[in-house]
């Protein structure tokens, strides 16, 4: 009997951080703080990018897509997490778990590809500036964004469907604060080798290949930056690139730790804390890092706050 058949009438018990009751109040503030920052920062980027014509460029098109992703991704996880951190009985309905699994997987996978698209955009802007407008035309940008969203959806359908077919044999105590594939695999009472193989293959496609391509792009960008004669301009470019790469490393690195570790060596308690980084922290960092040193965005924000936009 599959997970779907036997679990439809029973909630999942999310053990979450119940082993650390004193820490739950701190985690509640942590999650709430980062969730609110994510909403404010990313909504601001979407609004400004839409209202200010000078920002109607490929860079801000992708950044707006990333902001929308981050809002939806954290919203699929944070509210349920906040509720469970506040109540003694930490549960989620079977339907809620299925919805959370499909949505978070789709959005997370989409972001993995979209970050690679953004690195490609930066590579062409820096290394091929004379051809940038021709190459990064609106049609190509829309195609790249569409591929990101559709590939994320496909990944979710494969990942989640394979996982939800597993029999649980009455075990509904999920040792996590969200419904996530590695934690659900541990509930299965049958051999999960095939599922782990699917998890590995899909994870390589989404969390190993994209950061490798991003690294190559930034390698070429670094070479181009080194040819800049102005020390100040070179320092500014390196500072911006290092900030972008920091977010990329945190996002992909934490996902790789959770999804590509062998199941027998996976420390679930440690994994839960690491999951907080790519579910709560990086969606907050993205708008800060990608716009902090951007004069156009800061000028547009100033016009918005002064009512001139």
From Swiss-Prot:
One of its GO terms (cellular component) is plasma membrane. The keyword Acetylation does not apply. Glycans are attached at residue 5. The keyword tRNA processing does not apply. The chain crosses the membrane at residues 26-49, 58-79, 101-120, 140-158, 196-219, 237-259, 273-292. Disulfide bonds join 97-189. It comes from the Eukaryota. It is a multi-pass membrane protein. Residues 1-25, 80-100, 159-195, 260-272 are extracellular. It holds the Pfam family 7tm_4. One of its GO terms (biological process) is detection of chemical stimulus involved in sensory perception of smell. Residues 50-57, 121-139, 220-236, 293-309 are cytoplasmic. Belongs to the G-protein coupled receptor 1 family. This is Olfactory receptor 2G3. It comes from Homo sapiens (Human). The lineage of its organism: Eukaryota, Metazoa, Chordata, Craniata, Vertebrata. The gene is OR2G3.
């Amino acid at each position: 009997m599959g997970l779907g058949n036997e679990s439809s009438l029973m909630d999942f018990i999310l053990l979450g951080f119940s082993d650390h009751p004193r820490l739950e109040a701190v985690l509640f503030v942590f999650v709430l703080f980062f969730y609110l920052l994510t909403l404010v920062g990313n909504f601001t980027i979407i609004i400004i990018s839409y209202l200010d014509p000078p920002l109607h460029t490929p860079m801000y098109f992708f950044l707006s897509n990333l902001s929308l992703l981050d809002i939806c991704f954290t919203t699929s996880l944070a509210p349920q997490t906040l509720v469970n951190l506040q109540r003694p009985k930490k549960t989620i309905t079977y339907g809620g778990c299925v919805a959370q699994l499909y949505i978070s997987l789709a959005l997370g996978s989409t972001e993995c590809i979209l970050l690679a698209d953004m690195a490609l955009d930066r590579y062409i802007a820096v290394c091929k500036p004379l051809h940038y407008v021709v190459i990064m035309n609106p049609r190509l940008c829309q195609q790249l964004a569409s591929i990101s969203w559709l590939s994320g959806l496909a990944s979710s359908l494969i990942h989640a469907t394979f996982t939800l077919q597993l029999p649980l044999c009455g075990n509904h105590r999920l040792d996590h604060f969200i419904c996530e594939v590695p934690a659900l695999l541990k509930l299965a009472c049958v051999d999960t080798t095939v599922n782990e193989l699917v998890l590995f293959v899909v994870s390589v496609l989404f969390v190993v290949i994209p950061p490798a391509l991003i690294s190559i792009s930034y390698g070429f960008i670094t070479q181009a930056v080194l040819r800049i004669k102005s020390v100040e301009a070179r320092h500014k470019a390196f500072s911006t690139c290092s900030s972008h790469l920091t977010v990329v490393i945190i996002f992909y690195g934490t996902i790789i730790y959770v999804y590509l570790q062998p199941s027998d060596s996976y420390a679930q308690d440690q994994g839960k804390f690491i999951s907080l980084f790519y579910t709560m922290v990086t969606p907050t960092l993205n708008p800060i890092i990608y716009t902090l040193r951007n004069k156009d965005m800061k000028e547009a924000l100033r016009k918005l706050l002064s009512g001139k936009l």
